[in-house]
Amino acid sequence: MRIIVADCSAEYSERLNASLPLAKRVLLIKADNSLLIFSELGSYKPLNWMSAPCSIRDITPDHADDDVDTEVPQKVIRASADKSNDVLEVTLQRIYSDESYDLGEDPGLIKDGVEDHLQKYLAEQIERIGKGAKLVRREYPTAIGPVDIMAIDGNGEHVAIEIKRNGGIDGVEQLTRYCDLLNRDPLLAPVHGIFAAQTITPQARVLAQDRGFKCLLLDYEEMKGTEDDSLRLF
């Protein structure tokens, strides 16, 4: 993991055009080359990012210095998507810190009991999302974290399912990021989204439906009661 603190600006081009003016920010570059830009604003969501698979180039301009009042930056980091022409270019005007760390292998997120069981039961009862649905796998890996469940619907199209105990706007945002990323892969697209939870706030439901996601209410006790009891004695 490479962590950079710098006065920087950024430009994202091709699929969409977006820019960040000069300000002090934190850049994370992960081992898979994904690049994320953070600031004090917002919550956990980066201001902008380039997801893997992508390539990273460090460019040191001629006559580079750390004077924010000059036009010559210390460094430019260019992240280029492997499967599209998307480019995220970050201009580092002044670098305060640039450190790399070997974090080793992560054991992954350990979910609380109810949420983990909801995922288990829905995976076993995947036709709850629709007739003819089939499970691909639980904890489907992506560059930005695992999708709770990846499935294929009755039409043969992929479905990413985000599961929460109590579904709020943050969960919809998380599902949005997964679907945005997965739909860039021509082998998976189109990827639809389902937001599944025991309870879903009205605001989260409106946002999910606005983004084209289906909402699915999960009855924990009822799903638990349909477990395979063929080996139970009583």
Curated annotation (Swiss-Prot):
Domain of life (superkingdom): Bacteria
Pfam family for this entry, one: NucS_N
Coiled coil: none
Record GO cellular component, one term: cytoplasm
Keywords assigned by UniProt, alphabetized: Cytoplasm, DNA-binding, Endonuclease, Hydrolase, Nuclease
E.C. number: 3.1.-.-
InterPro entries in the cross-refs: Endonuclease_NucS, NucS_C, NucS_N, NucS_N_sf, tRNA_endonuc-like_dom_sf
Record localization: Cytoplasm
Gene3D superfamilies noted in UniProt: 2.70.180.20, 3.40.1350.10
GO molecular function: DNA binding; single-stranded DNA endodeoxyribonuclease activity
Annotated function: Cleaves both 3' and 5' ssDNA extremities of branched DNA structures.
Record family assignment: Belongs to the NucS endonuclease family.
Name assigned to this protein: Endonuclease NucS
Species assigned in the record: Bifidobacterium adolescentis (strain ATCC 15703 / DSM 20083 / NCTC 11814 / E194a)
